[in-house]
Amino acid sequence: MSFTLMDMGSENFEFNANVWHWKTTLEVIKSFDIVSEGKLRQMSYNATGVKVEKEEAHEIGTRIRDEILPKLGPDKRIFADLSITDKPDDGTFYKDDDEQWKNYSASYEWLKDFSDFCLRSKGFQVF
């Protein structure tokens, strides 16, 4: 499953996310307490068109840049439970219930790109 984030100020400015990165990113956003639980729930489904306003997007981008990226560094990843690892993603698909959480992570580079998108956007919609 994939998600397309479309800037509300320009139809040609968008950001693409797969479910593996997006689920983790939503947990990061949730930890900031910027958007409501209802909006977060809608953001977890593609094609909803839920809107993240400019101020929310900019705060998300700023907090990822200032709070999350310094903890990660270029060679680390963050999991959906917000734990951090320096192990590279080797593409293993974890099927065991106790290990499925390992399937969801976001790298420093991916979060940096998402943060940049948020900061440059006029708000965005999730499709």
Regions found by a protein language model. Give the residues of each.
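Acidic (Asp/Glu-rich) sequence patches and key acidic residues
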Residues: 1-127
